[in-house]
């Protein structure tokens, strides 16, 4: 006991959902065998399919799936395989989309499927609370709080890491405006006949913000939380590894949309990053942790003074931000 040392391993708390990345099919097959053998040492078992292990001699279902993510130029031509074998009896099937930790991941790495699913869930949630949200006898501020807590929370769950296109924001904004009109007892015909603008409904009647501003706020809070992490944290390293655009990098026809470009657009809209910097850490991290950050964001996004705040966090002693 005198030779023992204490090690804090907080990431070892999670032992349920596991996602692994392999760079080739051979690595996937060999790595799956190593993971299965390692789990057996701890008395754990991976739920994989068994040949002929189901009813009527059919293959049993597998709770473990694999997904092939081909290169961008090969995604239209390369077919998805059905499964791969671990041994003579067990196999792991492939899938084109998979729900992992509440988010839907597709083989083309496009967030359209996840955003459409969020819109469907938010629509169902709004219909459940419609009698309360559209009840004119209830105070407007209470209905607005209920809408933000129940409907918007479902709609924008996980939006901090979305790769958002302009068409995605249009769909989200359209749903938000349709719900707010219903809360005021209006439709498009009323707005057209009486010249009622969306700004009038959101700001004057319901005291709400446009959905794109709410989206930017959520992403900024996430980026601020990551910027205040210890640089040794995996989340900080993952963000910093893709935050800077390579010098001389040329974009393909049409602007490529990914998580980096979405974060960069949010930082530019908020005045925390210039358009030429590519979102480099040395620029936007000191800005988002600076004392005037909230003032800059409020001015750029048109928010009322004092309405946007970050949770205060101490300056890191080694990095200085």
What is the role of each PLM region?
Residues 1-321:
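Short linear motifs embedded in intrinsically disordered, charge-biased segments
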